[in-house]
Amino acid sequence: MKKLYLLYLLASFTTVISKEVTGVFNQFNSLIWSYTYRARYEEISTLTAKAQLEWALDGTIASPGDTFTLVMPCVYKFMTYETSVQLTANSIAYATCDFDAGEDTKSFSSLKCTVTDELTEDTSVFGSVILPIAFNVGGSGSKSTITDSKCFSSGYNTVTFFDGNNQLSTTANFLPRRELAFGLVVSQRLSMSLDTMTNFVMSTPCFMGYQSGKLGFTSNDDDFEIDCSSIHVGITNEINDWSMPVSSVPFDHTIRCTSRALYIEFKTIPAGYRPFVDAIVQIPTTEPFFVKYTNEFACVNGIYTSIPFTSFFSQPILYDEALAIGADLVRTTSTVIGSITRTTTLPFISRLQKTKTILVLEPIPTTTVTTSHHGFDTWYYTKKATIGDTATVFIDVPQHTATTLTTYWQESSTATTTYFDDIDLVDTVIVKIPYPNPTIITTQFWSGKYLTTETHKEPPLGTDSVIIKEPHNPTVTTTEFWSESFATTETITNNPEGTDSVIIKEPHNPTVTTTKFWSESFATTETITTGPLGTDSIVIHDPLEESSSSTAIESSDSNISSSAQDSSSSVEQSFTSADETSSIVELSSSSDIPSSSIGLTSSESSTVSSYDSYSSSTSESSIASSYDSYSSSSIESSTLSSSDRYSSSISDTTSFWDSSSSDLESTSITWSSSIDAQSSHLVQSVSNSISTSQEISSSSSEESSTSATDALVSSDASSILSSDTSSYYPSSTISPSDDFPHTIAGESDSQSFSFITSTVEISSDSVSLTSDPASSFDSSSRLNSDSSSSPSTDQRDILTSSSFSTLIKSSESRESSSGTILSEESSDSIPTTFSTRYWSPSGMSSRHYTNSTETSVSDVVSSSVAGDETSESSVSVTSESSESVTSESVASESVTSESVTAVSDISDLYTTSEEVSTSDSNSGMSSPIPSSEQRSSIPIMSSSDESSESRESSIGTILSEESSDSIPTTFSTRYWSPSGMSSRHYTNSTETSVSDVVSSSVAGDETSESSVSVISESSESVTSESVASESVTAVSDISDLYTTSEVVSTSDSKIVPSTSVPSSEQRSSIPIMSSSDESSESRESSSGTILSEENSDSIPTTFSTRYVSVSLTVGELSALPSLPGKLSHLPSSLSETSIGMTKSANLSPQFFSTSVDSALSYWASGSSSADHQSSATCDVSESSVEGNLSAMALGMSNSDDGLSEDTRSSSVAGKEEIELTSTNSVGEITLISYSSSSPTTHDHGRVSKSMGAAPLSSLFSVSVHAPLVTGLSDSDTFPSENSNRSRSFKESTDNTISISRESLGNPYSSISSPSDYDVKSFTTSRELVSSESILPFSDVMDANDMPTSGSNLHSMVFSISVLGEKFNANIEKHKNTNGHYSSMVFTYQSAGLEESDQRIAVTNTKFDQNKIDTTIDSNTFVTSLPFATTLNDQIDQAVPIKIPASSTAGFVSDVLKPDYSKSVQAESVQTDSTTYSEMMSSKRNKNSGFGTSSLNLKPTITVVTKSIDTKVNTMKEGGVSKQVSTTVTEQYDTSTYTPASLLVSDNSGSVSKYSLWMMAFYMLFGLF
C-alpha cells in the first residue's frame, strides 16, 4: 500500500511540474502537393499535401513531461495510418506527437506533443518533420466544415500554422475543381479510422427554382450502415471553387433514413438555391462496395429531371508516412588570440552527419591593473599570456588634487569647468549654478480649520512662491439703529487670525401711541422699546373722564368729511351732540390692513373696528329727493393714482333723507396703493334740517348704518336708493353689548367675494342732476370721457368685484342709463385679476401669463376686467333708455373720443405694448396703427355723436370661458424686432372688435374654446350721423418654428375702399363683421360670433411659416454649408480615379453614364416622374474640356415657386447627351460625383407652396464619367464599321460623335452599346485641397450671401470647364521633380456670384509621357494608379509590370506602392479566362448594361514573384579557401488584388466590354 501511495505522489509531482512550452516548431519550410498513395475516389488530389516544418528542443528550456502543440487550421485530417510521430535525433526520440484530426467536428487539426525523458539540461537537438495532411474545403453541412469551406480559394493562398503565439506561414497554389458546378456534386471523405466516411450529395441546379424533388443515396452491402443521427440537410446559393457549399440555409423537407438508405423529399425551393444532404456511414473495409445516388427534381418551368449516379469503392487506400529527421546540436568553445568573441557553425550534412557543431571562439582573458604616480604622463604596460592563461594590462596614471569652487551665473543650467595645473598638480574645478529664485509669500484663506503652507518651486531664473493658507476668521454680528429709513449691512474683514465684524444697521422702530384710561387721577406715560424690526409702544394713561363718551348734534346741518391716510393703525372717532349748530365728524383711518370707520347720526357712541385682509368692495350711489328745486356742485378735480401695491377703496354714500329740503353732496373717490388722497365735500342744502351720513359696504366688514336704513325705509317710493349688499366672510364676529361703546369686530380671510347691485329709480319730473367730473389717470394710461369714468383698479394679490352706477341728467331732459359689470373669479386661483393700461415710449412689458380684456362703451361706462387661465370671466355692458330721453348737448360740439385698444399680453420672451388706435367721431375716419408687424391690434370703439331728439339703445355681451387647467396661453401679442422672429410655439390668438358697441380681445389656446358674441339693438329712433366703423380681422396663428406677423386690415365706414396694412404673409385672416351706417329713423341689429376649437392633444398644424433650407450631400460627405456663396473648395469625397489601357484596345462607351441619386433608390421604386430631366454635355477640344450639367430637384415642377402640389417619392427619368471631340493628345478621366439623401415624407402628407417647415423635398445628384477619346490619327481604322455611331464618328469633319441615351425605370435595361474607339494608355490622379461641401445657389442672395426667402431654388445649373494645355505639346512647361502636371480648374456658375467666387477646386493630372510610350506594345499592360486613400495623398507615377506574351492572360492590377528596389519577375499568373469568356458572351447576348446577376463582379488577380538568393559557403584550410557547399534560397511572394479596373486580353489584344463597364460601375458607386 505504501508503494502505491508513493507512486501516486510521484505521478502527482510529475504532473505538477510539467508545463506548456512554445517555440519548438520554428519554421514552415514548404507545402508540397502529393499525387501518390491515395484512392482514386477519395480526397481531391490537389488538397493532399506534405507539410515540412523545422523544430528544435533545448534542455535548458524544456523538461521531460512538458507539452507543446502545433495547431493547423483548415486541415481535415492526417493522411497516414499512424496515430503519432516521434521527433528523433540520432535515433533517440525526444518528443512524441499524437495526431488529432478535426474532420467534421472541429475546424482545425492539431499535433499534440510531449517531451520524453531523453531530453536533459545539457542536450540540444533540432530537426524537421514531414506531415501528410488533407485540407478541408467542404463536403458536409456541419458547422465546422461550412467554416473551413471559406478558408481558401483557387490560386495562391497563404497557409498558416500556430505554435503558441508563433505563426508559421508559407504559400501554396490551390487548383480549383469547377467541373461539377452545374451538375450533381458527390463527395466521400474517409476518417482516420478508415472504417467510416462522410457521404455528401448536392442536387443539380434548377436556375428557375425547384417545384419538388428527391435526393439521397443507398447501398445493398451488408456492412454498409448509415448513422441517422449525423444527418445534415440544407440549401445553399453559394459554392466555392471546389463546388462545395459555403452556407447552409434550413428549408422545409422530409427525411427518410434507414441503415442502408437516406432520402430527403422537398417542395418549393427558391431560384438560385440547391439542396444537399450528408451523413456519416460505416463502410466495409475488406471488399469493394457500391453506393447509388438518387437525384430527381422538377423545376419551376415544369421540366422533370432524374439523374441517377453510382460510385464504386475498390481496394483499401494507401497513405503516406509521417517522417521526422533530427540531429544533435553541440556547442563548443575555443580560445583564440584576439579581442572579440566570434561564433561559427561547422559544416553539416544532414543525411551523413548526426551532430551539428557550433564553435564559439573566445579571446584570451585579460585583467587590468591601474596605478598612480606623481608626474604628468600616463603609462601603459601589458603582460602577455598563452592560451589557457590570463593576460594583465597595467595602467599608471599621474596623481592630481582638485579644488572645487561654486559660483552663481545668469544661466538656468549648471556648468562645470576644470582647470588643470601641470606644475603644482592642483587642479581647479569651477561649478556654475543658477542664482536662487526669489520667493513671494502670500497669505490667503481656505476652507480648512488649520494653518498650512504650500511651496511652489520654479525652474532656475523663475520665482518661487509660498502660500500660507489660514482658516477663515470668526465673525461677530451686531445690530444697531441708525438715522436712515432703510436697513443696511456693513462687513469689516480683518487680517488672518483676526475677527471679522458684520454690523446690521436698522432704521428706528415705528412707534404706536395708545391712550388708556385708568383709575388714577393723574396722567402718566409708559414707553415699551423692542428690538430691530419691531414696533415700539407708548402707552398714555389718562384719568377716566365720563364726558368724552358722546356729543350731541344740535345743528340742523351736518357735514361728514372722510379722509384716508397712511400712518399708524389707530382709529379715532368723535361725534358732536345734536344740540350743536354745526359739527364735523372727522374719520382718520390708515393701515396696511384696510380699516374703515363710520360716522353715525346717533347720540350713542360706537366704535367699529374692521380687519380685512386684502379685499375690498366699493359701492357708490347718489340719490336726490323729489323736491322741485335744488342744485348740486361736485368736485371739479379728482386725481386718481395707481401703483403696483394693493389699493383699498373708500366708498362714501351721501343720503339726503330730510323731508323738508335737501341738498346734494358730491363725493370723490380716491384709489391709491398707499391710500393717500384727499376728499373734499361741498354740501349745499335748501333747509337747515339736513343730516349727512355715510354708508360703507365693504368686503372687509359687515355693517350698516341704522340711520341710513331708517331714512331709506321712510323715504318716498319714487326716490328710494336700494342698496343690496352681500358679503361672505368665513370668520366674522359681532359682539353686541348693552354698554357703550358698541364694538363690532370682523375678521375675514384673504379671499372673499362681494356682490353689490345698485339701482337708481327716479320718477319725479322736477329733479335735475348734473354731474361733470373730470378725471385724470396719471399711472399707466389715460381715458377721457364725456360721461362718468370709473378708474381701473390695479390689484395683484386680491380679488375684487366692483359695481358702479352713475345717474346723469341734463336740463329739461330725462335720461336713465345703467351699467353693470359682473366679474367672477375662482377663489382658489392665483391672483391674476387685474387691468393694466400703460403708455410708455418703449412699449415694453415684462408681464408673463396675463389675460386682460378691456371694454369701453362710448358715453356710458369704461371698465377693465382681466382673468387668467384659471378664471371664468363674463363682461356685460348694457345701455337702456327710457321712453323719453333727449340728449341735446351731452358733450361739446367738437368731441374727440379715443378708441381704446384691448391689450392682452402674455409673452414668452419679448412683449411690446399696443398703441391705441384713435378715431374721430366727427371725421369718421380711423387711423391705422403704423406698424409693419402687428398682433392683436384691436380698435374697440369709435365714439359717435348723437343729435337731438334721438334715442339709442345698445347692448353688448362678451363671454369668455377658459379652461382652468390649461397652460396660460390666452393672450394677444404684438412685437417688433429686426429679425421678425418669435420664439413662441403653438399659440392661438383671436381678436374681435365691434364698432360703436363693445370691443374686447378674447384669446384661447388649442385647449380652449372661445365664443364671442356681439349684439347691438336699437329702440324706435336711432340716428348715427358720423360713426367711424372699423372692420375687424380675427387672426389665428400657430407656428412650429418661425411665426410671421399678421396685420389687421381695417376699413372705414365713411370711405368705401378698405385700407389694408401691408403684410408679406398672412394666415387665417377672417373678417368678422363690418359695421354700417344707418340714417335717421332706422333700426339696426347686428351680431357676430366667433367659435374656435382646438384639439388639445394634437400637434398644431395651423401655422404660418416659410422655412427653406437647402443642403447638398457630396459623395459620402454631408456637412452644413460653410462659406455660403463663396465656394472655394471641392469636397474630399470625389474619388481618386486612375485607369490604365493599351493601344488597340476596345473602349466601350457604356462607360459614359449619368446617374441621378447615386443610390439609385428612385429607379428601384419603379415609378417615374416627368418633371425631372438631367443632361450632360462634354466637349473635348485640344485645350479644354467643357460640360454643362443641369438637374431639377425631384418632385418639382416649373411653377413659380418651384414646388409641386404634393410630396412624391418619385423615380427619375434621365436623358443624357455626350459630345466628344477627339484630339491627338494623351487624355484624362474626369470624375465628378454629387449625391444626396432621398426626400422625406412629412407627417401632414402634403407640402404647401411655401414648403411648410420642411426642407426641399429632394436634392439632385449627378455623376459624370467622361474619358477623353484620344490618340486617333488619319491612318487609324475603326472596328465595327457597321456601327452607325462609328460611321458618324468617322465621317464627321470635326471628329465629333454624339451619344444620347434615355432611361426610364431601371437604368441598366436601356443602356446601349456604342462602338469602340481607339485610345492610348494614360493615367490620371487627383489632389484635392479641402473637404468642404458645396452649397446650391439661389436666384437672389442677401448681404450675407445666403439665399433670400423669395429665391427660386427649384433648379440649379452647373458648368464644368477644364482649362489646360495640350499634354503632348506643351507639357514641358509644367514639369517638376515628380512628373508632368497640367492644372484643371472646375468652375461652377450660378446667378448672384461673381466670377472670382466660382473657382472651387484645382485638380492636378500627372503622368510620365516617356514611361507610357516605352511600355505600350501588344503584349504588355500598364498598371493603373491606385485610388487615393486620404485627401492629399500624392500618388506615385505608374510603374508597369511586364507579363510574358506566353501568359494565360494579360491583366492590369492595382499595385499599392510596391517595393521598387526588388527585381520583380512574374513567376505565374492565374486567371479564369473561361469565366470571363462566359461573362463577355453573356454580355454580348443581352442588350443590357450589366449582364446576368450571377456574374462575379469582383475578379481577383494573383501575382507571384520569385526571388533567388544564392550563397556559396567556403572554408579556409591552410590559408586556401575551399568551397564547401552552395545554398540556394527561393522566395515566393504571392499578392492577390481585387482591381478597380481589369482589362482581360485575348490573343488579338481586344478588351472586354464587361471589364470597362465594370470599371465604370465601381467608380460610380465608390466601391473602392
Curated annotation (Swiss-Prot):
Q: Where is the composition biased (Low complexity)?
A: 547-662, 721-738, 768-793, 801-824, 872-904, 919-945, 993-1002, 1009-1030, 1063-1077
Main location, first listed in the record:
membrane
What does the PTM comment state?
Answer: The GPI-anchor is attached to the protein in the endoplasmic reticulum and serves to target the protein to the cell surface. There, the glucosamine-inositol phospholipid moiety is cleaved off and the GPI-modified mannoprotein is covalently attached via its lipidless GPI glycan remnant to the 1,6-beta-glucan of the outer cell wall layer.
Keyword set, alphabetical order: Cell adhesion, Cell membrane, Cell wall, Disulfide bond, Glycoprotein, GPI-anchor, Lipoprotein, Membrane, Repeat, Secreted, Signal, Virulence
One Pfam match, given by its short name, reads Candida_ALS
| Recorded superkingdom | Eukaryota
* Pro-peptide region(s): 1549-1568
Disulfide pattern = C74-C151, C97-C113, C206-C299, C228-C257
On induction, the UniProt comment says: Highly expressed in biofilms and during candidiasis infection dissemination.
Q: Which residues cross the membrane?
A: none
Gene Ontology cellular component annotations, sorted alphabetically: cell surface; extracellular vesicle; hyphal cell wall; plasma membrane; side of membrane; yeast-form cell wall
What GO biological process, any one, is recorded here? cell-cell adhesion
- Signal peptide segment: 1-18
Lipid attachment points (GPI-anchor amidated serine): S1548
Q: Where is the composition biased (Polar residues)?
A: 909-918, 956-992, 1046-1062, 1272-1286, 1294-1303
Matches recorded under InterPro entries: Adhesion_dom_sf, Agglutinin-like_ALS_rpt, Agglutinin-like_N, Agglutinin-like_N_N2, ALS, Fibrogen-bd_dom1
Function (record text): Cell surface adhesion protein which mediates both yeast-to-host tissue adherence and yeast aggregation. Plays an important role in the pathogenesis of C.albicans infections.
Question: Which PANTHER family does its entry note?
Answer: AGGLUTININ-LIKE PROTEIN 6 (PTHR33793:SF2), ALPHA-AGGLUTININ (PTHR33793)
Q: Which family does it belong to?
A: Belongs to the ALS family.
Please report the name of this protein according to its UniProt entry. Agglutinin-like protein 7
Organism, as annotated: Candida albicans (strain SC5314 / ATCC MYA-2876)
Upper taxonomic classification of the species? Eukaryota, Fungi, Dikarya, Ascomycota, Saccharomycotina
Q: Which gene encodes it?
A: ALS7
